């Protein structure tokens, strides 16, 4: 099969599948992306460059869409070059979030496009208006509607097909669109992410922070420390945890930028805001902000964790949740739809109200005290991962989906 992948940040969500195709052999794989240092054996890369940023005169709500159209044009130009060199794919696979796929129907008419649909925005549900501490501004509804412009264009493409990794994400799309989107649950490397019974008997050092076997380790991981991922609720739970467990150590992984939602006021960071709010209430000698960590350190942290916190608004679940389950962490997750799709309370973890720090602290303390329950939940999480999140099963399902799509078309 001749594959054309497109993702501005090579290889994006497609790393495992591209490697799998190379190992299968017999495929021709080309990947259009912006320039970066990434490299995968057997993959030819074609680089595109966006000629300019959105105009400052463009309406602020439309700038993201304009940037998507600029990307679409640049990707189409790269695709025309490939076509001129004789390359015509059997299938195009990419992520619809940045608009890159929109013009490829004009370059390769009849070629199926299997696009990754991540999230459809709504003005009255899911993440918008979820947290009363941050009520929607007067202009937010208009901005949210426009954020779906690329989504809607993508859903109208001829020969277009969709994939999405969770039922929750699929449910965000309009009913008329869901029939075009296949549920393809993403897998985890179960060998790389697996429990280590000896981890709690060794010292752990993460970015200079040392955790001994005597410590009760509470962990929290996010790309960035921000409200969308429950950072404020976690921080407000810490005073009680640290007071009632003098052996507790807390490691928080994540940067100080903003991945989702509004930036903090005064150009500060949410970490600074929460530290100021909780000044005098935290034993900061036992609260460790380690920033972003290497993947091996991340895995070591999960293997050692005595209680792992994962909270999110009703939005896209992080990869780290899947990896924590595969590692057999005792997980305390927010009782929000993207998390409850993975975590069954009392079976594969514990669910807590996102907005109730005292309840979060209570359940963390319960798991730190009741190690038998914590072990049972960790085993349940690992069992779920083995049954539902196997990387090999995911790749086999991906193969079947591609086969179904390609069989319906001829480029």
What are these model-predicted stretches?
Residues 142-203, 268-269, 273, 398:
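A short, active-site helix/loop in glycosyltransferases that binds the activated sugar's phosphate group
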Residues 345-346, 350-357, 366-371:
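Conserved acidic donor-binding segment of nucleotide-sugar-dependent glycosyltransferases
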Residues 330-333, 343:
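Short hydrophobic beta-strand element within catalytic cores of glycosyltransferases
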Residues 359, 366, 373-388, 394-400:
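A short, well-ordered alpha-helix in the C-terminal region of glycosyltransferases
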Residues 258, 262-292:
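Nucleotide-activated donor-binding/catalytic signature segment of Leloir-type glycosyltransferases, i.e.
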Residues 313:
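Aromatic "clamp/platform" in nucleotide-sugar-dependent glycosyltransferases that forms part
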Residues 52-62, 111-151, 191-203, 212-213, ...:
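Acceptor-binding helix/loop patch of EC 2.4 sugar-transfer enzymes
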Residues 204-229, 235-240, 250-253:
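Conserved donor-binding/catalytic core segment of Leloir-type glycosyltransferases
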